[in-house]
Regions:
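N-terminal secretory/targeting leader peptides
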Residues: 2-128, 145-366
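A gly/proline- and charged-residue-enriched helix-loop-helix capping module
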Residues: 127-140
Length: 366
């Protein structure tokens, strides 16, 4: 759906909801305002997880309220209806009508989907929204997912993440060798090339894996979520920045067959609810991370450190190699990479004299 059509649809949905008017399908002339739907949403998140999990639950509530209960959505935490990392397949085959997760969880099946979550040293949260909503990214995403019988919608944003929790100090490149680390997506592939053993485990297993030594290090999100999982009690060293996930976007995926059964006004309301959820989640993380960071700074058992420059330089070099190989893998990856990289280039130039320049100035005087 083009952005102009999307905004027009939102206005139609808002007007119909506020005024209580009948909704008549333009192509059939049939009044569908009394039709009701009960859907299931599967997610990758532990129950009640701040930000990610609660964001999915709030999305469902927002849709139900805006549709006057015409569309009710029951939310399942990861593992309740399907495994946490099986959301994509479950929604594609119709086990559930909706799913809430991160596109890079399915990189084995849809490699190019990683562009729609996060790319190492790539777009930050605001830049991702700009590319998706105005730069053609969302249209590419929707077209790419058609072959899997899915409709993707941006539905959450955490902002830049942290580099991860480590049970040993990282003072040089050599310290990465042999580490067993939970880090998904392209960041995981980059870390593998740096000598790390990349391991994928769902959020619910990270704490125990760190405690038992099954993991030496783990990247999850940032202070807000990491504290909620107790990761500060399982590892001592907390490194930044989140070079691998500068602006990770979450996705709502809808089974295409189910989507096609919805009246146009309900489709527009779902899209509007996702856009509101995207904004709300980013605000929640900005606030929650700031507060949780203060807690960690006051914890004598936690050391917050920057990754050494030589480590970041190596990770950037390896990231460039990984992304180049991904873009050469298939036609879809090449198309999406070109769109993404073209916008990253011009946006980075703008950031130098806007956001980055301001933050540099503020830090120099505060």
């Amino acid at each position: 759906m083009k952005r102009r059509e999307f905004v027009g649809g939102l206005a139609l949905a808002a007007g119909a909801t506020a005024c209580g008017k009948q909704h008549v399908e333009a192509d059939t002339g049939i009044d569908r305002s009394t039709e009701t739907f009960k859907w299931n949403m599967v997610t990758s998140w532990p129950p009640g997880l701040p930000g990610l999990g609660v964001g999915a639950e709030n999305l469902a509530k927002r849709v139900e309220k805006a549709t006057n209960s015409r569309l009710k959505i029951k939310v399942y935490a990861g593992g309740e209806l399907v495994p946490a990392l099986d959301v994509f397949d479950a929604v594609s085959r119709g086990t559930a009508q909706m799913g809430h997760d991160a596109a890079y969880y399915h990189r084995g099946k849809v490699p190019a989907a990683q562009y729609f979550t996060a790319i190492p040293f790539g777009l930050n949260a605001n830049e991702m929204n700009a590319w998706l909503y105005y730069g053609g990214g969302l249209e590419l995403w929707q077209e790419y997912y058609e072959q899997f019988n899915l409709v993707p919608i941006p539905a959450g944003q955490t902002g830049v993440q942290m580099g991860g929790w480590f049970n040993k100090e990282i003072n040089s490149i050599e310290d990465l060798a042999g580490l067993k680390m939970r880090i998904p997506g392209l960041g995981g592939e980059v870390m593998q090339r740096a000598g790390v053993t990349q391991i994928t485990v769902p959020a619910s297993e990270i704490f125990t894996s760190l405690q038992t030594g099954a993991l030496d290090a783990a990247e999850w999100v940032g202070p807000y979520n990491d504290v909620s999982l107790g990761l500060h009690k399982a590892a001592r060293y907390y490194y930044y920045p989140g070079w691998h996930e500068p602006g990770p976007t979450l996705e709502l995926i809808v089974n295409k067959d189910a989507w096609d059964t919805l009246p146009d006004d309900l489709k527009a309301i779902v899209e509007l609810a996702c856009q509101a959820g995207n904004l709300d989640m980013q605000a929640e993380y900005n606030y929650g991370n700031a507060r949780a960071l203060q807690q960690l700074k006051n914890d004598p058992n936690v050391e917050i450190r920057p990754l050494p420059d030589d480590v970041l330089k190596l990770l950037y070099k390896l990231s460039t190699e990984v992304i180049d190989e991904l873009s050469a893998r298939d036609e879809w990856s090449a198309r999406i990479q070109k769109s993404y990289a073209d916008f990253l280039d011009v946006s980075a130039q703008n950031q130098l004299i806007s956001e980055q320049a301001f933050l540099n100035a503020r830090s120099s005087v505060m």
